[in-house]
Amino acid sequence: MADLKAHIAKVASGAALSFAEAREAFGIIMSGEATPSQIGGFLMALRVRGETVDEISGAVDTMRSKMLPVTAPAEAVDIVGTGGDASGTYNVSTCAAFIVAGCGVPVAKHGNRALSSKSGAADSLVALGVNIELGPDQIAACIAEAGVGFMFAPSHHAAMRHVGPTRVELGTRTIFNLLGPLSNPAGVKRQLVGVFSAQWVEPLAHVLRQLGTEKAWVVHGDGLDEMTTAGVTRVASLEYGEVRTFEITPEEVGLQRSAAAALKGGDGEYNGKALRRVLEGERNAYRDIAVLNAGGALIVAGKAETLKDAVALASESIESGRALAALEKLVEVSNRKP
């Protein structure tokens, strides 16, 4: 049986693991061959030294190899955040997913229940009447008919059960906070990924490049794991092997700057209602941040050349009723008897 001890010793010495070594180490962990103490020691050694692009890439490669896959169109996108930003915003990326679907771009949304906040994507979707306990064929049907399907992370990443208790006991962020958003079960090649800290914006774009992603924006918005209307958003854009970084303000795309407090959400019930009101056409700070993030995803999807044009497309998706129709269709299809 492979042993994690050699990898722990290497990381503890300050050295970095290669892609292959990281892949092996996480293979040991996700196969249940490491003890909780070994897993905890390994994760904290990585965290203290700082995870490298190769280590994250190797870990994601292992996670992808063990996941339950979903079939989605080649042009499908995901809009996902790492969580863990402690901001308590409403479910921006979930709202943006319906807006993007309303623009005719298939969305394969990967997410979970709340881990550190009051409400994760799954919590607000359940409050809206979406059935999240679906098999791969049912999710594929949701994407085909509603333009959006939701993949509930625990249903697709059973190997994570080996690390769950250790992560809870550690009570602090680890490399696993970065792996989930990069391990989409539909294997999407285009993503808008929000990260909890600006330090990860550029490295994660390089991880996605190493793993074969075609186009992605990795973003951090002034403390949020998404693009923000309350300040400046840092972006690392990956396009066919090239990574470049830049900053975005809401004003430059025609949106008003919001107070950070205006973006705060609540529990799943509250966030679900807030999301529906945005899709029904209510104009507020929730809408502005949703169309900004939808705009980023539409750029990644190749639907617009400029973010200003993409934001206009996103607004039109709401005003035409198509974004709300995508939500209502998802509720219908997800609850259909298989």
Curated annotation (Swiss-Prot):
Residue sites binding anthranilate 2 per the record: R167
Task: State its cofactor.
Answer: Mg(2+)
Binding positions (Mg(2+) 1): S93, E226
Cross-referenced SUPFAM superfamilies, in alphabetical order? Nucleoside phosphorylase/phosphoribosyltransferase catalytic domain, Nucleoside phosphorylase/phosphoribosyltransferase N-terminal domain
Q: Where do the annotations place 5-phospho-alpha-D-ribose 1-diphosphate binding?
A: 81, 84-85, 89, 91-94, 109-117, 121
The protein's matches in Pfam families, at most eight in alphabetical order, are given as: Glycos_trans_3N, Glycos_transf_3
Q: In which pathway does it act?
A: Amino-acid biosynthesis; L-tryptophan biosynthesis; L-tryptophan from chorismate: step 2/5
Membership in a protein family: Belongs to the anthranilate phosphoribosyltransferase family.
Protein's name according to its UniProt entry: Anthranilate phosphoribosyltransferase
Origin species: Chelativorans sp. (strain BNC1)
